[in-house]
């Protein structure tokens, strides 16, 4: 399309930086154990940390997708960066002595990340050459994974080298958000119009009710995100329970290994999509993830570590692939689809509760059946619901 050709390489720089900041929202999961120990929280109270980080996806995504349709994607990105920045500076102003301050900070960071997801995924299409949207979205998710990984690695590095703890994340993230905001404001991005009719709240839900295919795809995003958060939150406990590896010593490292694998997988995915179709790659990714989850049931430490890497590589491209395939399948419904699919990220607040219930009543290992079922559903989507000729 001509409009994408008008966007220079420089226009994509702030968009990729937005994806980096988008990854900061995943800190809600990686910091849970560290914050729990800091404030001596119960497991129930600690559960409000990831809940706060993901609940805003369910509340804000559709309303801001509708606002985006009437204004611009760039405006929504700017608002998202500002809200996330506001959340990160709150502890700096009020201090870290109260847990409620951290909870409010994570809530606003999650709200900002929700807006970045709503506008970031479709605006990537505006700065991508024709036919390269899936590839660039995978690269964008690779950059996002760097942001996610930083939530696990920066606290560990700060403790090792500077004698500091997880609180160092807040000023570092604040600076990154400020830089992204400035670069975005001064950039010029030609945005593609995605339909003659402005979407409404009613049209979004009508899309779910009238198009079974879209409803199944949105549910796929819901269960996939829930599976990813479940894996990230349960892997440290799995390693301690089965192999005696202490969460205090290896918890962050195990989550870091998972996100490092995701980051690597997204980079490789951006390259692989130059040669194979997005739908084929989605099926391969789902199968690879299922192989990795199966490896967790073997009960051998070395196999478990390799399985974590395999799971991360498989998980890496599921979200950007499903998103990009769907948007290209229904080009006139980009705003509604963006709102619906980002709303479905609220699965990250719901599915882990089910996984935790299974872990409490059966075992940590058996709890991975829950994300495995989610992956089987993603495989079903790739094989049956994401064919180009299905309308």
Regions found by a protein language model. Name each.
Residues 59-99:
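Conserved MFS/SLC helix-loop-helix module at the cytosolic interface between two early adjacent transmembrane helices
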Residues 10-36, 121, 231-236:
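Extracytoplasmic
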Residues 60-73, 265-277, 359:
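Helix-to-loop junctions at the C-terminal end of transmembrane segments
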Residues 28-29, 211-256, 263:
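Extracytoplasmic gate region of multi-pass secondary transporters
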Residues 99-115, 303-317:
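Hydrophobic core of transmembrane alpha-helices in multi-pass small-molecule transporters
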Residues 140-189:
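Helix-loop-helix hairpin linking two adjacent transmembrane segments in secondary transporters
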Residues 132-155, 339-351:
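Glycine-rich segments within core transmembrane alpha-helices of 12-TM secondary carriers
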Residues 105-142:
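Cytoplasmic helix-loop-helix junction between adjacent transmembrane helices
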């Amino acid at each position: 399309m001509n409009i994408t050709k008008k966007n220079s390489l420089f226009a994509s720089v702030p968009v990729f930086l937005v994806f980096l900041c988008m990854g900061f929202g995943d800190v809600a999961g990686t910091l849970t154990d560290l914050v729990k120990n800091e404030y001596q929280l119960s497991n129930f109270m600690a559960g409000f940390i990831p809940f706060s980080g993901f609940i805003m996806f369910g509340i804000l995504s559709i309303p801001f997708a509708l606002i985006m349709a009437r204004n611009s994607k760039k405006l929504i990105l700017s608002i998202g960066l500002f809200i996330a920045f506001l959340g990160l500076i709150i502890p700096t102003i009020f201090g870290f002595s109260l847990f409620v301050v951290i909870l409010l900070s994570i809530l606003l960071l999650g709200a900002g990340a929700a807006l970045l997801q709503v506008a970031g995924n479709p605006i990537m299409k505006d700065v991508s050459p024709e036919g390269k949207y899936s590839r660039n979205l995978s690269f964008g998710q690779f950059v996002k994974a760097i942001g996610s990984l930083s939530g696990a690695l920066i606290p560990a590095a700060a403790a090792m080298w500077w004698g500091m703890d997880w609180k160092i994340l807040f000023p570092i993230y604040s600076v990154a958000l400020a830089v992204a905001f400035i670069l975005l404001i001064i950039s010029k991005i030609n945005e593609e119009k995605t339909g003659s009719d402005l979407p409404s709240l009613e049209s979004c839900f009508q899309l779910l009710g009238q198009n079974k295919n879209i409803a199944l795809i949105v549910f796929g995003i819901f269960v996939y995100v829930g599976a990813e958060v479940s894996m990230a939150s349960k892997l440290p406990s799995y390693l301690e329970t089965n192999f005696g590896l202490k969460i205090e010593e290896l918890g962050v490292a195990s989550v870091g290994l998972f996100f490092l694998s995701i980051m690597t997988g997204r980079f490789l995915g951006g390259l692989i999509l130059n040669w194979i179709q997005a739908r084929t790659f989605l099926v391969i990714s789902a199968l690879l993830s299922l192989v990795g989850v199966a490896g967790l049931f073997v009960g051998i430490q070395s196999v478990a570590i390799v399985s974590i890497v395999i799971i991360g590589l498989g998980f890496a491209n599921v979200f950007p692939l499903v998103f990009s395939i769907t948007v290209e399948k229904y080009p006139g419904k980009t705003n509604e689809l963006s709102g619906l699919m980002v709303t479905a990220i609220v699965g990250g607040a719901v599915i882990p509760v089910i996984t935790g219930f299974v872990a409490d009543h059966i075992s940590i290992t058996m709890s991975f059946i829950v994300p495995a079922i989610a992956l089987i559903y993603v495989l079903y989507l790739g094989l049956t619901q994401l064919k180009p000729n299905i309308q």
